[in-house]
């Protein structure tokens, strides 16, 4: 069957537009005329192999996504994230796309080189809490998760290491939007049988907020992986119950109430 250059062109155009890259920048990057580049996106001009590899680098994609019709990727999740968060800057979009590639690279190394086995996380959305109070669900899930991991009542010293040990890909990247705390993506390539959990934490934040954001996104992995993606903002939308739950989980997971009561209860005479 003949290769469909029109489909390739549409993929290239979607990838370029998702990162807010102009056709002029792309043509300049390839050192070809603007019209020649537009003809590539329109499927009228056949792209060369080296040009395709260069564009894959520029657009932060795996080149196989462009040339394979059924190549699995997180493209739909990322595009949906950008669509729902249209105000994302060009640099933040690039940082997010680079984060996705880092997760893919890490997954390849862990599976193919280090033979790491997949870890199955509990899906607390399927758990029967017996009530619909989201903040309380977050607190109770934190208790269940600490029990599952045998954490006792001690504060978590390294939340990033703990999350990585659960088979989750987690990275810190600098995002220029200071209102973004972190984000979660369920990557279909990283784990074909289980959710491919990927977490990004904004490196611009102080360490305390980074730790809280990591635990917050961990809650989204435990509850909300079916949504495919989400971005967490410091200033939460009113009425977002999933974010209430994730905040409640994060605080109680990092430092349980029992520890606070033990360490800071008023001294008795």
PLM region descriptions:
Residues 1-269:
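Short juxta-domain linker segments that transition from a proline/glycine-rich
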